[in-house]
A protein has these predicted regions:
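Histidine- and/or cysteine-centered catalytic micro-motif in compact active-site loops
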Residues: 63-65, 74-75
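Short Gly/Pro-enriched turn/cap motifs at secondary-structure boundaries
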Residues: 50-53
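C-terminal binding/interaction regions
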Residues: 2-48, 97-168
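Short, well-ordered amphipathic alpha-helical segments that serve as non-catalytic structural scaffolds
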Residues: 41-44, 86-94
C-alpha cells in the first residue's frame, strides 16, 4: 500500500507544504515563514468548505510536532447541531495522517481574516495541543493557556491515559 502525498499548501497547488522530511518543531521554533504556510493551508481548506446554509466558509491549519501541516474546513448540515467546525476536520486529518501534537494553529473566514476558535473548538484543540499550542488571533499570537485559561482537560479525569490503557 502506498502512502498518499502530503496536502497542498494552496488551492492552486499540488505541491506539499514542506520540501524535506518533517523535523520536530516546538513553539519557540515558529518563524514568520511557518505562519505563512499555515495561513496558506487555512485558506486552501476554507475554499473547500461546505456551507450551503450560512455561506460562511472557515478554514483551519495546524502545525504538528513532527513538522506536518494539517488542515480542515467547516462542513454544514441541515440539522445544524451536527455541523462540523473546521477545527473538527483538522483534528480528523491529524489522526488520519499519523497523529501527533499540534504546535501552532491558524483559522480564517471566507475573506481570509483571522478567526478565534469557539469555546468547543478551543477545548478540542487543547486536547490535541496542550497549553503550549500557539493560536493566531486577531489581537496577536498566544498560547492555549491564555486563550483557554484554567481549562478542563485529561488531567482532571481519574487516572492517566497510560493507566486507563492498562485497565483495558
Amino acid at each position: 500500500m502506498t502512502v498518499p502525498e502530503p496536502r497542498a499548501s494552496a488551492p492552486e497547488s499540488t505541491a506539499p507544504v514542506w520540501s524535506e522530511e518533517p523535523t520536530p518543531v516546538c513553539p519557540e521554533d515558529l518563524s514568520e515563514g511557518t505562519w505563512e504556510l499555515l495561513r496558506a493551508e487555512a485558506k486552501r481548506a476554507m475554499a473547500r468548505a461546505y456551507v450551503p446554509y450560512s455561506n460562511y466558509p472557515v478554514g483551519a491549519a495546524g502545525l504538528v510536532d513532527d513538522g506536518r501541516i494539517v488542515g480542515g474546513c467547516n462542513i454544514e448540515n441541515a440539522s445544524f447541531g451536527v455541523t462540523l467546525c473546521a477545527e473538527c476536520s483538522l483534528v480528523s486529518e491529524l489522526f488520519m495522517t499519523g497523529g501527533g501534537r499540534l504546535v501552532a494553529f491558524d483559522c480564517v473566514d471566507g475573506e481570509g481574516k483571522t478567526l478565534v476558535p469557539c469555546g468547543r473548538c478551543r477545548q478540542l484543540l487543547l486536547e490535541h495541543g496542550g497549553n503550549d499550542l500557539v493560536i493566531n488571533m486577531p489581537s496577536g499570537r498566544a498560547p492555549m493557556s491564555v486563550v483557554l485559561p484554567e481549562a478542563f482537560g485529561p488531567d482532571h479525569l481519574a487516572g492517566t491515559p497510560s493507566e486507563h490503557e492498562a485497565k483495558h
